[in-house]
């Protein structure tokens, strides 16, 4: 139902008063966005180095070490396209590979994402809505989290939000071809950064389809030659990489062997509300009181749905944002019943549509509903603050780098270092300061099936050196080995069990869920045995 004339007059008066107050502030009114970006930067750089590098980050760093030609080859065997890794390689050459430096390459785009979100909101709605959206975006826990990892997700947010902004400009003024050129370049960059960019293409086509319902036949942008030419150009720009993508699709079974895909939990009825909690609270919410677990996500989905349904503005801004948030979420959820890919980090960019749309919904409320609008804003900010608390609750003294540094301090020449899992291996390489050849424990299954990684997924980072890295049995260690470091989970069962009877535990160090253990091998005549055997 359309708002009454009285409600619209109330809204116009409120917005006029708000904008008048800003105009009276003089030059300060032009810097209203600065505190928002300052908040976004403070949150994304806070505790940036508190958590240790984990497996996925380690894989980014190993990929970035390759020469340009080799990087292209290995990225073709990884589960992500190469652009981020090329950029990370250049960043490290300029600023080094210290943990603050490499994570800054994600934190800075994370701040840019907030700025783009504010800009997009201002183009779609009022300055008040842009301020509200800016605060919610700056605080959004999922955006903060993935702005603090050496991965491509914050960079992807820059490409996709900027592309959406360029599309909005073009829709308003179709004669501005440069907006469409910018759109093409940004979407191509998105495709070279992450395969889920395809979801953004669907969002944009769907929005133009919605606009068709209110456009005369000759004005329908979705049928414009320029639009089709732009999409064809994106495909042409992607052609150099397309054979690699097709090759990857044909080797899904190899990716499953290495645990790169196929590890995700099957989806259920709880998955969608749980994902919304994950975006905002950094917790799946499964331990929350059941009515609250359902009510809060349903409230947000209701706000999204009602705002989009009541959207009667010419360019349907609420419809664009609802599609940006809901279409990828629900599509990936549906696909996950066949092949589970319902993962927070793959959708975190699209989650940015939620706070923007909530801000616009609050801004559109008439004055008589300002109190419920304020309550919704405070509620969402409160949940986000709890999510930030969960993000920043990190014990710096219980991190994976602790056991690695323990090994570095106590390492002796000719010691062997064996790791039980690929993710431990990828993290360990970053912190390792020894001259040892790290080895990955790959015991065959009970039926004799090998567990060695292959040339796809994480395996592409080590497979070329597999002969030196893979260790199928502890008994395969050289006969003259005297000391062995075992790196594994600190939980049972022991991934190296059973250990040879002549191994003696000398010391160990836990941290970040891992355990480093030093064993001496008590072999040969007693006088020749290493210290610890006597």
Tell me what each language-model feature is.
Residues 2-9:
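N-terminal intrinsically disordered, acidic low-complexity segments at the extreme N-terminus
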């Amino acid at each position: 139902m359309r708002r009454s004339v009285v409600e619209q007059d109330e809204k116009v008066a409120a917005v006029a008063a708000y904008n008048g107050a800003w105009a009276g502030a003089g030059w300060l009114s032009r810097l209203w966005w600065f505190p928002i970006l300052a908040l976004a930067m403070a949150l994304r750089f806070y505790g940036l180095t508190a958590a240790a590098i984990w497996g996925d980050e380690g894989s980014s760093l190993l990929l970035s070490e390759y020469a340009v030609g080799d990087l292209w080859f290995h990225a073709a065997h990884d589960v992500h396209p190469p652009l981020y890794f090329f950029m990370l390689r250049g960043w490290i050459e300029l600023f080094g590979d210290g943990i603050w430096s490499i994570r800054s390459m994600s934190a800075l785009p994370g701040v840019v994402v907030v700025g783009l979100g504010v800009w997009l909101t201002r183009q779609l709605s009022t300055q008040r809505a842009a301020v509200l959206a800016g605060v919610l975006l700056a605080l959004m826990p999922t955006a903060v989290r993935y702005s603090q990892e050496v991965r491509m997700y914050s960079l992807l947010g820059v490409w996709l939000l900027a592309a959406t902004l360029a599309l909005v400009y073009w829709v308003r003024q179709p004669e501005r071809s440069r907006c469409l050129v910018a759109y093409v370049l940004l979407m191509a960059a998105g495709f070279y950064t992450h395969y889920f960019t395809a979801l953004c293409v669907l969002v944009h086509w769907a929005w133009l389809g919605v606009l068709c319902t209110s456009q005369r036949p000759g004005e329908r942008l979705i049928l414009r030659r320029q639009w089709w030419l732009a999409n064809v150009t994106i495909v042409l720009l992607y052609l150099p990489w397309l054979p690699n993508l097709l090759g990857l699709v044909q080797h899904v079974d190899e990716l499953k062997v290495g645990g790169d895909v196929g590890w995700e939990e099957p989806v259920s009825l709880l998955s969608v509300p749980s994902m919304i909690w994950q975006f905002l609270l950094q917790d799946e919410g499964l331990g929350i009181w059941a009515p609250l677990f359902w009510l809060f996500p349903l409230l947000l989905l209701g706000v999204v749905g009602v705002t989009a349904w009541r959207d009667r503005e010419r360019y349907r801004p609420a419809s664009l944002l609802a599609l940006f948030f809901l279409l990828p979420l629900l599509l990936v959820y549906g696909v996950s019943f066949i092949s589970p890919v319902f993962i927070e980090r793959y959708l975190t960019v699209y989650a940015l549509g939620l706070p923007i749309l909530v801000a616009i919904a609050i801004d559109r409320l008439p004055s008589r509903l300002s109190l419920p609008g304020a309550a919704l804003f405070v509620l969402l900010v409160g949940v986000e603050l709890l999510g930030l608390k969960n993000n920043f609750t990190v014990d710096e003294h219980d991190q994976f780098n602790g056991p690695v540094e323990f090994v570095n301090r106590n390492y002796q020449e000719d010691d062997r270092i064996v790791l039980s899992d690929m993710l431990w291996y990828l993290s360990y390489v970053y912190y390792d300061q020894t001259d040892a050849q790290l080895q990955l424990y790959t015991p065959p299954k009970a039926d004799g099936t090998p567990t060695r990684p292959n040339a796809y997924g994480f395996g592409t980072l080590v497979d070329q050196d597999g002969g030196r890295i893979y260790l199928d049995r502890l008994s395969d260690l050289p006969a003259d080995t005297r000391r062995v470091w075992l790196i594994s989970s600190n939980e049972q069962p022991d991934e190296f069990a059973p250990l040879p009877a002549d191994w003696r535990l000398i010391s160990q160090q836990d941290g970040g869920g891992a355990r480093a253990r030093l064993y001496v091998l008590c072999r040969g005549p007693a006088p020749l045995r290493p210290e610890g055997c006597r």
